[in-house]
Amino acid sequence: GILSLVKGVAKLAGKGLAKEGGKFGLELIACKIAKQC
């Protein structure tokens, strides 16, 4: 369901954030979640 999808995305995002780092990554995720890019 939706929750497992979100968890999967969060895992991928976490790996991406570990590489890219910090605020920009979080803003990008928030933007994608809110669909207000």
From Swiss-Prot:
<keyword id="KW-0204">Cytolysis</keyword>
<comment type="similarity">
    <text>Belongs to the frog skin active peptide (FSAP) family. Esculentin subfamily.</text>
</comment>
<keyword id="KW-0044">Antibiotic</keyword>
<keyword id="KW-0929">Antimicrobial</keyword>
<feature type="disulfide bond">
    <location>
        <begin position="31"/>
        <end position="37"/>
    </location>
</feature>
<dbReference type="GO" id="GO:0042742">
    <property type="term" value="P:defense response to bacterium"/>
</dbReference>
<comment type="function">
    <text>Shows antibacterial activity against representative Gram-negative and Gram-positive bacterial species, and hemolytic activity.</text>
</comment>
<keyword id="KW-0878">Amphibian defense peptide</keyword>
<keyword id="KW-1015">Disulfide bond</keyword>
<protein>
    <recommendedName>
        <fullName>Esculentin-2A</fullName>
    </recommendedName>
</protein>
<dbReference type="GO" id="GO:0031640">
    <property type="term" value="P:killing of cells of another organism"/>
</dbReference>
<keyword id="KW-0964">Secreted</keyword>
<dbReference type="Pfam" id="PF08023">
    <property type="entry name" value="Antimicrobial_2"/>
</dbReference>
<dbReference type="InterPro" id="IPR012521">
    <property type="entry name" value="Antimicrobial_frog_2"/>
</dbReference>
<dbReference type="GO" id="GO:0005576">
    <property type="term" value="C:extracellular region"/>
</dbReference>
<keyword id="KW-0354">Hemolysis</keyword>
